[in-house]
Design a protein with these regions (language model features):
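Non-catalytic positions within long, well-ordered alpha-helices that form the structural scaffold/packing
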Residues: 47, 139, 197-198
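Hydrophobic faces of well-ordered beta-strands that scaffold small-molecule active sites
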Residues: 19-23, 54-56, 89-93, 118-120, ...
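An N-terminally biased module of ancient metal coordination in phosphate/nucleic-acid-related enzymes
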Residues: 1-86
Length: 243
């Protein structure tokens, strides 16, 4: 899928052996796949990119999606029943940093996205007032927070990058959304994504795919050689997270 004439490269050509650990493949428990049939169709699309390993990460937020292992694992089993041969799928969560997360941490009820790592997110309107406390509680349970799509939090879009640096100082790794490499979420978010990449602040990348439309767009992402060079080590580090 190399585009010789445009001197650009398809992102998906780098994904062989990649584990997609931020997606909404599990049916009926958040704003992702509606049915197991939708889940399997999305997995087959991923397979076209060379991706056969998944950690499903449904939203976990007290107000809208109060998921627990008791709701997540039955949804996982629905997918496993018809999982195409050669694929593997596990379940975790994308945890809103709210009181519900604190409660789940205290109950030892949090599903890790990788060994000792928990995928977290914030509201798109503002950071939680008790952000420092939540990050401390996460790490106090011997978990490493991976912040989903930091490029999408507009309240951090100042020129100094100090707020991002503070999160790094507090122990957060950053996970970039693939679609943030395009104007899908807006040109401001696309710009911030590349700025974070250029500053070496991104640790991992994943799809955050909610539906087939997202995967079709990911399949069409083309990169310049300079952009490719920025992303290659991020993709390799993402692969290494699951070795």
């Amino acid at each position: 899928m190399l585009s010789i004439f445009q001197k650009k490269y398809f992102l998906v050509d780098l994904l062989e052996g990649f584990t997609d650990f931020h997606n909404h493949l599990l049916p009926g428990i958040d704003d992702g796949a509606n049915s197991a049939e939708d889940s399997i169709a999305m997995i087959k699309k991923f397979n076209e990119f060379g991706v056969t390993n998944f950690v499903a990460s449904p939203h976990v937020m007290g107000e809208f999606y109060p998921n627990t292992p008791e709701t997540i694992f039955p949804a996982l089993e629905k997918v496993k029943k018809n999982l195409p041969h050669g694929n593997s799928i596990k379940a975790a969560g994308e945890y809103m940093m709210d009181q519900y997360l604190i409660d789940q941490l205290e109950k030892n009820n949090v599903l890790n996205v990788a060994e000792n790592c928990v995928l977290v997110e914030m509201s798109y309107f503002q950071a939680p007032i008790n952000l420092a406390e939540i990050l401390f509680k996460i790490q106090n349970t011997n978990l490493k927070p991976i912040l989903a799509h930091p490029e999408r939090y507009a309240f951090y879009h100042d020129s100094s990058f100090d707020k991002y640096k503070d999160l790094k100082t507090r122990g957060c790794d950053f996970q970039l959304n693939m679609l943030s490499l395009t104007p899908h979420y807006g040109t401001g978010i696309q710009k911030k994504a590349f700025q974070l990449l250029e500053r070496g602040m991104i640790d991992f990348i994943s799809s955050d795919a909610h539906r087939m439309e997202h995967l079709e767009k990911i399949g069409n992402i083309k990169l310049k050689k300079k952009q490719l060079n920025l992303l290659e080590p991020i993709i390799e580090k993402s692969k290494a997270l699951f070795k």
